[in-house]
Regions:
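Periplasmic c-type cytochrome electron-transfer domains
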Residues: 1-73, 96, 108-131, 143-182, ...
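Gly/Gly-Pro-rich "capping" loops immediately C-terminal to redox-active cysteine motifs
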Residues: 75, 87, 91-130, 149-160, ...
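Glycine-centered loop/turn positions within well-structured domains
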Residues: 80, 99, 145, 207, ...
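Sequence/structural segment immediately N-terminal to covalent heme-attachment motifs in c-type
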Residues: 67-91, 126, 189-216, 220, ...
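Extracytoplasmic/luminal low-complexity segments enriched in Pro/Gly and acidic/polar residues
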Residues: 191-196, 218-222, 226-298
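Sec-exported extracytoplasmic/periplasmic mature domains
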Residues: 79, 83, 87, 106, ...
C-alpha cells in the first residue's frame, strides 16, 4: 500500500468515527428531549389520568392500579386548588378557620375514624369537594344548618324568621354554658357554673345546644357540627373569648364548590387523595395495614 492510499484510508476511517460520534450525540440529545413515557415507570399498572373520569370514586380508592394514579394526580390538584386554604400539609390554616384534613375528625359523614367505623367513604369527600359547604349550590353541605347567633342583632334574616328575635339566654346563662364547654374540652372551668351550664346545654327550651352538638357535646357528623370535647376541632378558637363570640354571633363556615372548576378525573383524584390522609396525622399515604382498616365500600 503506497503512502497516498494509506492517507486516504486514514481519512475515511476518521470520517467514519466522527460520523458515528455525531449520530450517537444526536441520539442522546433526542432521548434527552423526548417526552417521558410514564408507562416505563408503571408498566401494566399505568393509568392515564382521564381513565379516572368514569369509575366511581369508591372504586378508584379500592383499586391498586387506579388508586396509584389518583394519588399522584390528587396531590397535584390539592396543591393547586386546596392548599391555599387547608395548608400544604393539609393541617388547616388557623386564620382561615379551615379544618385539619389529617385528623380523625370528619364533618358531614358517618362514624368517627377512631371508632373503626366504615361509614366514611371517598364519596363523602367527593360530595363536599364537588358541591362545597354553604357555597350557594343546591347540593352544598350545611345549607340548612347554621350555628344560631344567640344575640338577635347578629342573626341572619332566615334565622330571625325561623327562631324569632328573642334572646334565648341571658349573659349570665351564656357564661355558664361557656364554663360547661370549657369543662368537656378538658380545660379549667368554674365547676358550679359548668354544672348549671350543662343543664342549659341540654334544655330544649333554652340553650338547646345538644340538638346540633349531641348529648355530651361530641357533635353530629351529618350536621357538620363541632365535637366540643376536642379542642383541636374548634375552627374558631377554644378559649373563653372565642367561645363567647361563637355563641353570641354564630358561625357559618363556607367552602366553594369545585363541580365546575375541576375535570371529573381531577375531582375524583383529589377526593381519593384527601380520603387517604384522614386519620393519618401526617401528610402521607397510610401504611397498608392502616388503609385496610378504612377500606372503602362499593
Amino acid at each position: 500500500m503506497d503512502k497516498k492510499t494509506r492517507v486516504l484510508r486514514s481519512r475515511y476511517v476518521m470520517a467514519g468515527v466522527m460520523g458515528a460520534a455525531v449520530l450517537a450525540a444526536v441520539a442522546v440529545a433526542e432521548q434527552a428531549t423526548a417526552p417521558h413515557d410514564p408507562t416505563d415507570d408503571y408498566g401494566e399498572f399505568y393509568v392515564r389520568p382521564e381513565e379516572l373520569a368514569s369509575p366511581s370514586v369508591n372504586r378508584i380508592a379500592r383499586s391498586l392500579r387506579l388508586n396509584r394514579q389518583a394519588m399522584v394526580l390528587g396531590k397535584k390538584v390539592y396543591d393547586e386548588h386546596c392548599a391555599s386554604c387547608h395548608g400544604a400539609d393539609l393541617k388547616g390554616i388557623p386564620d382561615q378557620h379551615t379544618p385539619d384534613l389529617t385528623d380523625a375528625e370528619w364533618r358531614f359523614s358517618g362514624d368517627d375514624l377512631e371508632s373503626g367505623g366504615l361509614k366514611k367513604l371517598p364519596s363523602d369527600v367527593e360530595w363536599t369537594v364537588r358541591y362545597g359547604v354553604r357555597s350557594g349550590h343546591e347540593n352544598a353541605r350545611g345549607a340548612e344548618v347554621n350555628m344560631l347567633a344567640f344575640y338577635p342583632e347578629f342573626r341572619t334574616k332566615e334565622d330571625t324568621e325561623d327562631f324569632g328575635s328573642d334572646k334565648f339566654l341571658t349573659d349570665a346563662e351564656i357564661d355558664e354554658v361557656i364554663e360547661y364547654v370549657l369543662q368537656i374540652s378538658g380545660q379549667q372551668a368554674d365547676r358550679a357554673k359548668a354544672t348549671r351550664g350543662e343543664v342549659l346545654f341540654h334544655d330544649n327550651t333554652k340553650g338547646n345546644c345538644f340538638d346540633c352538638h349531641d348529648n355530651g357535646g361530641t357533635g353530629i357528623d351529618t350536621f357538620g357540627s363541632t365535637n366540643l370535647t376536642r379542642r383541636s376541632s374548634y375552627l374558631w378558637g377554644s378559649d373563653r373569648a372565642s367561645i363567647r363570640e361563637s355563641i353570641i354571633k354564630g358561625r357559618r363556615g363556607v367552602m366553594p364548590a369545585f363541580d365546575d372548576k375541576l375535570k371529573p378525573e381531577e375531582l375524583k383524584a383529589v377526593s381519593v387523595f384527601i380520603f387517604w390522609q384522614a386519620g393519618t396525622g401526617e401528610s402521607s399515604q397510610p401504611t397498608p395495614s392502616a388503609r385496610e382498616n378504612r377500606r372503602p365500600n362499593p
